[in-house]
Regions:
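Catalytic cores of Mg2+-dependent Asp-rich isoprenoid enzymes
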Residues: 2-7, 11-254, 260-387
Length: 387
């Protein structure tokens, strides 16, 4: 174990030298603003500190980006993660969550100025729910309860007004792109709340699942692509339409990884993202999946293959990117996703009972290898060929 830690530390020191090669500065030849963007003002929120506890892999990717890209991308993620916290607040009935989610969407659009108090009320209700549940069991309240709130989520809700103010400090073009993205994401989250208000049920078919993954993640690939084409000189030699398609498929693939990894907990929460027509063809229902029946394995494996195809699109997308720093930040989630799929395949249907997660030591190794070894487009091509 000690040797593993030393090895990771050595890799990370080399990774830091790579980052210093492409420091954030107005004179950087790799990434410069273009178009009509004005210079961004200092943000009213420390986006990296808020990102770290709520998304390990995204935090690592964002750190690699130059400021001109990091600020709109990080703020978009923080807003999406905040809306996700609202949608997942089990301390409130679905109707109330939908109402609050709609208000938050209006606040992002600049049409609700009093969202802060509502979110603080939500925070109090979640804390009260956790404490009440713990008292009834005679146990202490841990830091992270499925029926309560994590410290990272608490920080997001407490900082929501600052995040919204920071959005207004972005350039008009960045504000437009972030708001368009969040309008799509919150629509998908709203549909989620409406769809499963009546208990455990499955999505109707594969198209409905693909539509859902576009609403909550495929649109992020489109957002990333548009921002990079607008802000990064010599971003890629490929056509924007090609990159938009690859980016969309990449985002969908990442969301499918999340769905596959979290399938067990989603089922226990009353949500089944696997198509009902595929389950029916295997003589299964959504409720049957709680017992991890062997007949479900071919369906599960099919969607692992679909997720892998999306990650392959992500690798093709990253290979096409010219600036090394942006390329590395783009490919890291794909590398973590590929490893997650391998672990899911190894676990089989046991993954429905025990959540699979890539160990932190492996993630550190991926950061090092991706930063040092896979910054080269030719090496990325070889890595893609081995998938």
């Amino acid at each position: 174990m000690e040797n593993e830690r030393k090895g990771a530390g050595s890799h990370l020191r080399r990774a830091s030298r790579f980052r210093s090669y492409d420091r954030e500065s107005s004179g950087s030849p790799a990434v410069t603003s273009r178009g009509s963007d004005r210079a961004e003002q200092p943000l009213a929120v420390n986006e990296l500190e808020l990102l770290k506890p709520v998304s390990r892999s995204f935090y690592l990717s964002i750190r690699l980006l130059p400021r001109t890209l990091r600020e709109p991308v990080a703020l978009a993620y923080l807003l999406a993660r905040t809306s996700d916290t609202i949608a997942d607040s089990n301390a409130m009935p679905a109707e109330k969550r939908i109402e609050l989610l709609d208000r938050f969407a209006r606040a992002i659009a600049g049409k609700d100025q009093s969202i802060g108090k509502a979110l603080k009320d939500l925070l109090l209700s979640k804390q009260d729910g956790s404490q009440s549940s713990s008292r009834s069991r005679g146990t202490k309240t841990p830091q992270d309860l499925s029926s309560g709130i994590t410290e990272g989520e608490k920080a997001l809700l407490e900082s929501a007004e600052k995040i919204l103010r920071a959005l207004k400090n972005l350039s008009p073009e960045d504000q437009r792109d972030v708001r368009e993205l969040l309008a799509i994401i919150t629509r998908g989250q709203r549909e989620d709340l409406t769809r499963w208000s009546g208990g455990l049920a499955a999505l109707a078919n594969a198209q409905e699942l693909l539509d859902y993954t576009h609403l909550v993640a495929g649109c992020v690939g489109e957002f990333w692509t548009r921002v990079c084409f607008r802000k990064v000189q010599s971003f890629t030699a490929r056509l924007e339409a090609d990159m938009l398609e690859l980016g969309t498929n990449y985002g969908r693939g990442l969301q499918l990884v999340n769905i596959l990894r979290d399938a067990g907990s989603d089922l226990r929460a009353g949500r089944c993202y696997f198509p009902e027509d595929e389950l029916r063809a295997a003589d299964l229902s959504a409720s049957d999946l709680l017992d991890a029946p062997a007949a479900f394995l071919p369906i599960y494996s099919r969607w692992i293959a679909e997720a892998r195809a999306g990650l392959d699109a992500g690798l093709e997308y990253a290979i096409a990117i010219n600036p090394a720093r942006v390329r590395v930040a783009t490919v890291l989630p794909a590398m973590i996703g590929v490893r997650t799929l391998s672990l899911l395949e190894e676990s089989g249907l046991d993954a429905l009972r025990t959540r699979v997660k890539v160990p932190r030591s492996e993630v550190r190794g991926m950061i090092a290898s991706t930063t040092i070894t896979l910054a080269s487009q030719s090496r990325l091509r070889r890595a893609r060929a081995q998938l």
